[in-house]
Amino acid sequence: MTKNTGFVFKFLQVVAWIIFVGVCIETGALAVNFVYSLFNPLVLKNLYNKLDLSAMYEQSQFVFFLIYGFILSISLLKAFLFYDVIKLISKLDLQKPFSEFVSFQISRISKVTLSIGISSVIATEIVKTISQKGFDVNQLNEYWTDGEAFIFMAAIIFIIATIFKRGIELQSENDLTV
């Protein structure tokens, strides 16, 4: 491993940690706001990140819980995604990159990324439907943008995971031959 490669991996690990901490703070704030709003609905006018869902809550509590559930679940999935990325980067051995752990982590990252994408696409479609019924949904789009991009990224990561699985098979065959 060259000096530059080691530096790049350390840099990526730091960036992944920063993103992970940020996403965890966002998820925690959303969860705390949600629980607090159950006891005090007046808080709904000023949720995390200036999100105002008070009108939605007054129109339909079911829709409010559904939409907030999507917001929380997508945020939580993003936290899981970056946690898995951190585990992968911290345990990756570039001298022997084809290991069961790396293959498992890449496969898991693919599944979590696909879950984010599918959840985002479903949430987008639900928001389109409820906007036609008179709900104000303008401020919700930032919580599930790029669902299609996450699905495409999951497909690419799945291909990489498949290549790693094949690499492990070839490596074990090679070890048996020697």
Language model feature labels by segment:
Residues 67-90, 157-169:
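Transmembrane alpha-helical segments in integral membrane proteins
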Residues 38-59:
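Perimembrane loop-to-helix junctions flanking transmembrane segments
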Residues 2-8, 81-105, 176-178:
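Cytoplasmic juxtamembrane regions at transmembrane-helix boundaries
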Residues 34-45, 87-90, 128-137, 177:
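Transmembrane helix-loop junctions in multipass membrane proteins, especially transporters and channels
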Residues 3, 114-178:
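Alpha-helical transmembrane segments of multi-pass integral membrane proteins
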Residues 95-127:
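Hydrophobic alpha-helical transmembrane segments of integral membrane proteins
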Residues 21-37, 124-125:
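Alpha-helical transmembrane segments of multi-pass membrane proteins
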Residues 4-27, 107-110:
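Alpha-helical transmembrane segments and their helix-start/interface "positive-inside/aromatic belt" motifs
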